[in-house]
Amino acid sequence: MTNKVVKIGDIPVANDLPFVLFGGMNVLESRDLAMRICEHYVTITQKLSIPYVFKASFDKANRSSIHSYRGPGLEEGMKIFQELKQTFGVKIITDVHEAHQAQPVADVVDVIQLPAFLARQTDLVEAMAKTGAVINVKKPQFVSPGQMGNIVDKFIEGGNDQVILCDRGSNFGYDNLVVDMLGFNVMKQVSKGSPVIFDVTHALQCRDPFGAASSGRRGQVTELARAGMAVGLAGLFIEAHPDPANAKCDGPSALPLDKLEPFLQQIKAIDDLVKNFPELDTSK
């Protein structure tokens, strides 16, 4: 299978190339916090020679409770992203939830993300495809890896083949997620070698059946990330926070920001090792 290369500016993304880090914060809580977190990521990834794309949401439109914090919104969010790009020279990924958001967001950021809950919404897919931007498709928790080729085909029919696929776990009964390590290769195959990345943060989510917010298993982030990267992936998607207990969204799954460097040292070592192995075809 030939591995497809998708370029985010000058950053090549492919399953057989050194992994790209898609990292940042869950939601833009404030301009100052975004600057602080982005600067830390940039410093560490430059030190470790890891290609880097900053991640944050400007609007969490799918919160469980109507009272939960959603973010600064489109206009203010784009202003913050523009300042981050100007200050740090960083590439940015963010998600869109409605078709009318696609073009104004693509005018500012480098990658637009199709949320897992919306990944089969054809009108949204078509609007995103028309922008010509690089697309990151989150695999829905309720969709099998083998079905992801259909979503990629929608983008291709819409004139955009610059697609990255991202796994964030699959439903395992009620209110729990598991990650099928065999599914990564299935997604590579059905997408004809498109880059596949792993969202370890949201794969750690779990829920109180009667609660209004997600819980998480932050203490297992290193083990799960190691396992995923051992498969041989194009990138890792992770969120970090200086004070996870007081984060406005998904704090229980967020990596403590001060653990980012030792965490990435381990992930890079695994990625370097795996991608130096010769390809071994055991299907025959």
UniProtKB/Swiss-Prot annotation:
Cell location: Cytoplasm
InterPro entries attached to this UniProt entry: Aldolase_TIM, DAHP1/KDSA, KDO8P_synthase
Superkingdom assignment: Bacteria
Cellular component annotations (GO), alphabetically ordered: cytoplasm
Catalysed reaction equations from the record: D-arabinose 5-phosphate + phosphoenolpyruvate + H2O = 3-deoxy-alpha-D-manno-2-octulosonate-8-phosphate + phosphate
Keyword Protease among record annotations: no
Pathway: Carbohydrate biosynthesis; 3-deoxy-D-manno-octulosonate biosynthesis; 3-deoxy-D-manno-octulosonate from D-ribulose 5-phosphate: step 2/3; Bacterial outer membrane biogenesis; lipopolysaccharide biosynthesis
Top EC category: transferase
Keywords noted in UniProt: Cytoplasm, Lipopolysaccharide biosynthesis, Transferase
Main location: cytoplasm
GO molecular function: 3-deoxy-8-phosphooctulonate synthase activity
Enzyme Commission code: 2.5.1.55
GO biological process, one term: keto-3-deoxy-D-manno-octulosonic acid biosynthetic process
Gene3D superfamilies in alphabetical order: Aldolase class I
One Pfam family linked to the record: DAHP_synth_1
HAMAP family the record matches: KDO8P_synth (MF_00056)
Family: Belongs to the KdsA family.
PANTHER family hit by this protein: PHOSPHO-2-DEHYDRO-3-DEOXYHEPTONATE ALDOLASE
Stated name of the protein: 2-dehydro-3-deoxyphosphooctonate aldolase
Protein source organism: Pectobacterium carotovorum subsp. carotovorum (strain PC1)
Gene name per UniProt: kdsA
